[in-house]
Curated annotation (Swiss-Prot):
Sequence similarity: Belongs to the PTH2 family.
Stored NCBIfam families: arch_pth2, PRK04322.1
Function: The natural substrate for this enzyme may be peptidyl-tRNAs which drop off the ribosome during protein synthesis.
Superkingdom of source: Archaea
Stretches of the chain forming a coiled coil according to its record: none
EC number: 3.1.1.29
Reaction(s) this enzyme catalyzes, per UniProt: an N-acyl-L-alpha-aminoacyl-tRNA + H2O = an N-acyl-L-amino acid + a tRNA + H(+)
Record localization: Cytoplasm
UniProt name for this protein: Peptidyl-tRNA hydrolase
Record SUPFAM superfamilies: Peptidyl-tRNA hydrolase II (SSF102462)
Main localization (coarse): cytoplasm
Length: 112
């Protein structure tokens, strides 16, 4: 079981902003999962990986694949209180789900 969080590398988020957006995505996708995958993921150590995307359109393409695969996922839009304009799409989380299912969506992306 794992979760992949894909963050945009093209919008110049500071380290703190990046950490917050990754956390928002992780929690939102966790909430999108059913009780069985949530329990299994928590019991297996809550494995996560943070990956890079190069554009908003890439995040939406990945989200579409996750949707078609029936995987829990969440797209994060920033509130715009600090570094980014309101509504800026910053991250996508896929999972928690079986590793191979998450890899169908995010397996070709580089580490952040």
């Amino acid at each position: 079981m794992k979760q992949a969080i894909v963050a945009r590398a093209d919008i110049g988020m500071g380290e703190g902003k990046l950490a917050a957006q990754v956390a928002h995505a992780s929690l939102s996708a966790y909430e999108d999962a059913g009780p069985k995958p949530r329990k299994a993921w928590k019991g297996a150590g809550q494995k996560k990986v943070v990956l890079k995307a190069t554009s908003e359109s890439e995040l939406f393409e990945l989200a579409d694949v996750a949707e078609r695969e029936g995987l829990p996922h969440a797209v994060v839009r920033d509130a715009g209180h600090t570094q980014l304009d309101p509504g800026t799409v910053t991250a996508l989380a896929v999972g928690p789900a079986e590793d191979e299912l998450v890899d169908r969506v995010t397996g070709d992306l580089p580490l952040f």
